[in-house]
Amino acid sequence: MRPAANQYEICFKCHANSNNKPQNANYSVYGRTPYRYTYAVLSDPYNIRLDLQSSVARHNVTQPSRGSVAPSLRLKMLDLSGNPTGRSLQGGGSYLYCTDCHNSDSARGSGGIGPNGPHGSSYFHLLERRYEYDAFPATPGSNTAAPAYTPGLLGTYAICDKCHDLDNSLLSQATTADVVFHKHYTHVVLQHTSCSTCHSAHGIQGGTSINNAHLVNFDKNIVGPDNKGRLYLDTTARACYLTCHGVLHNPKTY
Protein backbone atom coordinates (compact mmCIF):
# COMPACT_ATOMS: atom_id res chain seq x y z
CA MET A 1 0.00 0.00 0.00
CA ARG A 2 1.31 3.44 -0.93
CA PRO A 3 1.73 5.54 2.24
CA ALA A 4 0.00 8.90 2.52
CA ALA A 5 2.16 11.89 1.69
CA ASN A 6 -0.20 14.34 3.40
CA GLN A 7 -2.35 14.08 6.50
CA TYR A 8 -5.54 14.94 4.61
CA GLU A 9 -5.13 11.87 2.40
CA ILE A 10 -5.80 9.68 5.45
CA CYS A 11 -8.96 11.66 6.21
CA PHE A 12 -10.08 11.46 2.58
CA LYS A 13 -10.15 7.67 2.77
CA CYS A 14 -13.56 8.04 4.47
CA HIS A 15 -14.51 11.69 3.99
CA ALA A 16 -13.99 12.16 0.24
CA ASN A 17 -15.11 9.67 -2.42
CA SER A 18 -16.33 6.99 -0.01
CA ASN A 19 -19.87 5.77 -0.65
CA ASN A 20 -20.38 5.10 3.05
CA LYS A 21 -20.33 8.67 4.36
CA PRO A 22 -23.62 10.23 5.58
CA GLN A 23 -25.65 11.65 2.72
CA ASN A 24 -28.22 13.86 4.42
CA ALA A 25 -28.43 16.78 6.82
CA ASN A 26 -30.50 14.83 9.37
CA TYR A 27 -27.44 12.84 10.39
CA SER A 28 -26.84 14.10 13.92
CA VAL A 29 -25.32 11.28 15.95
CA TYR A 30 -22.05 13.17 16.33
CA GLY A 31 -23.33 16.71 15.83
CA ARG A 32 -25.80 18.39 13.51
CA THR A 33 -24.82 18.47 9.83
CA PRO A 34 -25.78 21.69 8.01
CA TYR A 35 -27.49 21.52 4.62
CA ARG A 36 -25.82 24.19 2.52
CA TYR A 37 -27.28 26.47 -0.13
CA THR A 38 -25.16 24.93 -2.91
CA TYR A 39 -25.91 21.28 -2.05
CA ALA A 40 -29.02 21.06 -4.23
CA VAL A 41 -26.90 21.21 -7.41
CA LEU A 42 -24.09 18.91 -6.26
CA SER A 43 -23.81 15.18 -6.92
CA ASP A 44 -21.60 14.55 -3.88
CA PRO A 45 -22.16 17.46 -1.45
CA TYR A 46 -20.46 15.85 1.56
CA ASN A 47 -17.21 15.18 -0.28
CA ILE A 48 -14.67 17.20 1.72
CA ARG A 49 -11.99 16.77 -0.96
CA LEU A 50 -14.16 18.63 -3.45
CA ASP A 51 -14.91 21.35 -0.90
CA LEU A 52 -11.21 21.97 -0.33
CA GLN A 53 -10.46 22.07 -4.07
CA SER A 54 -12.74 25.08 -4.47
CA SER A 55 -11.45 28.04 -6.45
CA VAL A 56 -14.15 30.27 -4.93
CA ALA A 57 -13.52 29.95 -1.19
CA ARG A 58 -11.81 27.34 0.98
CA HIS A 59 -9.50 26.92 3.94
CA ASN A 60 -5.91 26.18 2.96
CA VAL A 61 -5.68 22.43 3.62
CA THR A 62 -5.01 20.93 0.18
CA GLN A 63 -4.08 24.23 -1.46
CA PRO A 64 -1.72 26.89 -0.06
CA SER A 65 -3.07 30.10 1.40
CA ARG A 66 -3.39 33.04 -0.93
CA GLY A 67 -1.27 36.15 -0.55
CA SER A 68 -4.22 38.26 0.62
CA VAL A 69 -4.84 38.21 4.37
CA ALA A 70 -8.24 38.13 6.08
CA PRO A 71 -8.29 41.23 8.31
CA SER A 72 -9.34 39.17 11.35
CA LEU A 73 -6.48 36.68 11.00
CA ARG A 74 -4.01 36.38 13.88
CA LEU A 75 -0.27 36.46 13.29
CA LYS A 76 0.10 33.06 14.99
CA MET A 77 -2.29 30.23 15.80
CA LEU A 78 -3.22 29.98 19.51
CA ASP A 79 -2.76 26.91 21.71
CA LEU A 80 -5.37 25.72 24.21
CA SER A 81 -4.08 28.17 26.81
CA GLY A 82 -4.38 31.14 24.46
CA ASN A 83 -0.65 31.47 23.84
CA PRO A 84 0.71 32.00 20.31
CA THR A 85 2.27 28.90 18.76
CA GLY A 86 5.05 28.83 16.17
CA ARG A 87 2.49 28.41 13.38
CA SER A 88 2.37 31.55 11.24
CA LEU A 89 -1.01 32.30 9.67
CA GLN A 90 -0.33 35.37 7.56
CA GLY A 91 1.28 35.53 4.14
CA GLY A 92 0.84 33.24 1.17
CA GLY A 93 1.91 29.63 0.88
CA SER A 94 0.95 28.30 4.31
CA TYR A 95 -1.19 25.23 4.98
CA LEU A 96 -3.58 24.04 7.67
CA TYR A 97 -3.87 20.45 8.87
CA CYS A 98 -7.17 18.66 9.39
CA THR A 99 -6.07 18.18 13.00
CA ASP A 100 -5.81 21.94 13.52
CA CYS A 101 -9.59 21.77 13.92
CA HIS A 102 -10.44 18.07 14.34
CA ASN A 103 -8.45 16.84 17.30
CA SER A 104 -8.60 15.73 20.90
CA ASP A 105 -9.89 18.57 23.07
CA SER A 106 -6.76 18.16 25.22
CA ALA A 107 -4.20 17.43 22.50
CA ARG A 108 -0.55 17.64 23.52
CA GLY A 109 0.30 19.34 20.25
CA SER A 110 -1.97 22.22 21.24
CA GLY A 111 -0.61 22.49 24.76
CA GLY A 112 -2.89 19.97 26.47
CA ILE A 113 -2.12 16.72 28.29
CA GLY A 114 -4.04 14.27 26.12
CA PRO A 115 -3.23 12.36 22.92
CA ASN A 116 -2.91 14.09 19.57
CA GLY A 117 -5.32 13.22 16.79
CA PRO A 118 -9.06 12.97 16.12
CA HIS A 119 -9.64 9.99 18.42
CA GLY A 120 -12.21 11.60 20.69
CA SER A 121 -13.41 14.99 21.87
CA SER A 122 -16.05 16.44 24.16
CA TYR A 123 -17.14 18.63 21.23
CA PHE A 124 -19.30 17.59 18.27
CA HIS A 125 -17.63 16.67 14.97
CA LEU A 126 -14.43 15.76 16.82
CA LEU A 127 -13.54 19.43 17.08
CA GLU A 128 -10.66 20.47 19.28
CA ARG A 129 -12.60 23.44 20.61
CA ARG A 130 -16.15 24.63 21.04
CA TYR A 131 -18.32 25.55 18.05
CA GLU A 132 -22.07 26.08 18.48
CA TYR A 133 -24.90 25.76 15.97
CA ASP A 134 -28.34 27.35 15.84
CA ALA A 135 -31.16 24.99 16.83
CA PHE A 136 -33.59 23.84 14.14
CA PRO A 137 -36.48 26.32 13.72
CA ALA A 138 -40.02 25.09 13.08
CA THR A 139 -39.50 26.04 9.44
CA PRO A 140 -36.39 27.45 7.72
CA GLY A 141 -36.33 31.21 8.21
CA SER A 142 -38.48 31.28 11.34
CA ASN A 143 -37.13 32.25 14.74
CA THR A 144 -35.12 29.71 16.70
CA ALA A 145 -33.14 29.31 19.88
CA ALA A 146 -29.63 30.52 19.24
CA PRO A 147 -26.44 30.36 21.28
CA ALA A 148 -25.64 33.50 23.27
CA TYR A 149 -22.14 34.64 22.45
CA THR A 150 -19.42 34.21 25.06
CA PRO A 151 -15.80 35.21 24.34
CA GLY A 152 -12.55 33.55 25.29
CA LEU A 153 -10.80 30.20 25.13
CA LEU A 154 -13.97 28.29 26.03
CA GLY A 155 -16.25 30.70 24.19
CA THR A 156 -19.06 29.94 21.78
CA TYR A 157 -16.82 29.84 18.70
CA ALA A 158 -13.46 28.99 20.26
CA ILE A 159 -12.38 26.94 17.24
CA CYS A 160 -12.67 30.07 15.04
CA ASP A 161 -10.89 32.19 17.64
CA LYS A 162 -7.88 29.86 17.40
CA CYS A 163 -6.92 31.63 14.16
CA HIS A 164 -9.27 34.63 13.95
CA ASP A 165 -9.09 37.37 16.59
CA LEU A 166 -12.85 37.53 17.05
CA ASP A 167 -13.16 39.96 19.93
CA ASN A 168 -10.70 42.53 18.59
CA SER A 169 -11.91 42.50 15.00
CA LEU A 170 -15.03 40.71 13.74
CA LEU A 171 -16.98 40.94 16.98
CA SER A 172 -15.64 44.23 18.29
CA GLN A 173 -18.33 46.35 19.90
CA ALA A 174 -17.17 49.57 18.28
CA THR A 175 -19.51 51.04 15.68
CA THR A 176 -16.68 51.37 13.17
CA ALA A 177 -15.77 47.70 13.59
CA ASP A 178 -19.33 46.60 12.89
CA VAL A 179 -19.13 48.62 9.66
CA VAL A 180 -15.67 47.40 8.65
CA PHE A 181 -16.59 43.79 9.44
CA HIS A 182 -20.04 44.09 7.91
CA LYS A 183 -22.36 43.55 10.88
CA HIS A 184 -20.70 40.48 12.38
CA TYR A 185 -21.13 42.04 15.84
CA THR A 186 -24.83 42.69 15.21
CA HIS A 187 -25.50 39.18 13.96
CA VAL A 188 -23.37 37.08 16.32
CA VAL A 189 -23.25 39.06 19.57
CA LEU A 190 -26.56 40.94 19.57
CA GLN A 191 -28.76 38.55 17.59
CA HIS A 192 -27.04 35.27 18.56
CA THR A 193 -26.57 33.90 15.06
CA SER A 194 -24.11 31.02 14.72
CA CYS A 195 -21.10 31.38 12.41
CA SER A 196 -22.29 28.14 10.78
CA THR A 197 -25.60 29.67 9.70
CA CYS A 198 -23.76 31.76 7.10
CA HIS A 199 -20.33 30.16 6.70
CA SER A 200 -19.20 26.74 5.51
CA ALA A 201 -15.94 25.83 7.22
CA HIS A 202 -14.12 23.58 4.72
CA GLY A 203 -14.74 25.14 1.33
CA ILE A 204 -17.45 25.65 -1.25
CA GLN A 205 -17.91 23.42 -4.27
CA GLY A 206 -20.40 24.56 -6.87
CA GLY A 207 -20.45 28.19 -5.75
CA THR A 208 -19.64 31.51 -7.39
CA SER A 209 -17.41 34.41 -6.41
CA ILE A 210 -20.45 36.70 -6.24
CA ASN A 211 -22.67 34.47 -4.09
CA ASN A 212 -20.15 32.49 -2.06
CA ALA A 213 -17.07 34.60 -1.36
CA HIS A 214 -15.61 34.45 2.17
CA LEU A 215 -16.97 30.92 2.70
CA VAL A 216 -20.57 32.16 2.72
CA ASN A 217 -22.90 29.21 2.08
CA PHE A 218 -26.15 29.49 4.02
CA ASP A 219 -27.44 26.57 6.11
CA LYS A 220 -30.89 25.94 4.61
CA ASN A 221 -32.02 24.21 7.79
CA ILE A 222 -31.93 27.67 9.40
CA VAL A 223 -32.24 30.16 6.54
CA GLY A 224 -35.30 30.35 4.28
CA PRO A 225 -36.16 32.31 1.12
CA ASP A 226 -37.54 35.84 1.16
CA ASN A 227 -41.16 36.65 0.22
CA LYS A 228 -40.23 36.42 -3.46
CA GLY A 229 -38.59 33.01 -3.18
CA ARG A 230 -35.02 34.33 -3.26
CA LEU A 231 -32.23 32.93 -1.11
CA TYR A 232 -28.79 34.22 -1.95
CA LEU A 233 -26.05 36.71 -1.15
CA ASP A 234 -24.83 39.28 -3.67
CA THR A 235 -21.33 40.31 -2.59
CA THR A 236 -21.11 42.92 -5.35
CA ALA A 237 -24.19 44.80 -4.10
CA ARG A 238 -23.50 43.70 -0.49
CA ALA A 239 -27.08 42.50 -0.16
CA CYS A 240 -28.79 39.43 1.33
CA TYR A 241 -32.06 38.08 -0.05
CA LEU A 242 -33.50 35.61 2.48
CA THR A 243 -35.41 35.15 5.72
CA CYS A 244 -33.51 34.29 8.89
CA HIS A 245 -34.59 34.10 12.55
CA GLY A 246 -37.97 35.50 11.54
CA VAL A 247 -36.48 38.59 9.88
CA LEU A 248 -37.14 39.26 6.19
CA HIS A 249 -34.10 40.37 4.16
CA ASN A 250 -35.62 41.76 0.97
CA PRO A 251 -32.82 42.71 0.72
CA LYS A 252 -30.80 43.86 3.70
CA THR A 253 -27.44 45.40 2.94
CA TYR A 254 -24.25 45.06 4.92
Put a short name on every predicted segment:
Residues 1-254:
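A motif-centric signal for short, conserved binding hotspots located
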